[in-house]
Amino acid sequence: LSPDSDCDRAESDRNDRLSEVKITRTENLSEAQKQSIIRLWNAEYPVQIQHSGIDSFDEYLRPKANLRHYLLIDPDEIIRGWLATFIRDDERWFALLVDGSQQKKGFGTMLLNKVKEFENEINGWVIDRENDVKANGELYLSPIGFYLKNDFEILSDVRIENETISAVKIRWSR
C-alpha cells in the first residue's frame, strides 16, 4: 500500500467514526467546553463577532434566560457542533455552529432536529449577505439555504443592522 492510500483509509475511518456522533444536552458548560465552542465560533463566524476568550463568551451568554446547550460530540470526545437555545423577548431563540470540516454531512440538521423534539418554535438571526470574512480570510457564506431546507421561514421585514452584523430573522414552528 502506498502512503496515500493509508491516508485515504485513515480519512475514511475517521468519517465512519464521525457518523457515530452523539448529542449531549446540558444547561452548564465546563471551561473546556467553552474553550472548544469559542474555537469553533472564531473559526466559523465572521471576524467582527469573534470572542476574545471565556470572559467575552460568558458576557454573550449571561443575559440569555433559560439557556440550554446541545453539543455535537465525535467518538474522540471532540465538540464538532454547538446549538444553544434561550429566551429573548418572550421567544425561544437559538445559535448554531458546526465545525467547517464537518459541514454538509447532516450534523447541523441533526442538532436542529434534536431541538425540534423539545420546542414548538425557535428563532434566530442569520447573516444573509456574503460580504463578511472569517478568521482564515475566507468569505463567510450565508447559511440561509441550509435553514430554508430545514423548514425555517425568513421574516424579511425583521432585521438587525449595526456596525457588527447585518442579519435577517428566521423562524421554525410546528
List the predicted regions and their residue ranges.
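Conserved GNAT acetyl-CoA-binding A-motif
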Residues: 118-135
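Short amphipathic alpha-helix that is part of the acyltransferase structural core
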Residues: 17-55
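C-terminal "cap" of GNAT-fold acetyltransferases
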Residues: 129-131, 139-145, 153-174
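Conserved beta-strand in the GNAT
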Residues: 71, 77-86, 92-97
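Conserved acetyl-CoA-binding loop-helix of GNAT-fold acetyltransferases
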Residues: 104-117, 139-141
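Active-site rim helix/loop that mediates acceptor-substrate recognition in acyltransferases
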Residues: 46-70
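A short, internal acetyl-CoA/4′-phosphopantetheine-binding micro-motif in the GNAT/acyltransferase core
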Residues: 95-104, 128-131
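A conserved beta-turn-beta hairpin within the catalytic core of GNAT-like acetyltransferases
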Residues: 87-94, 103, 120-122
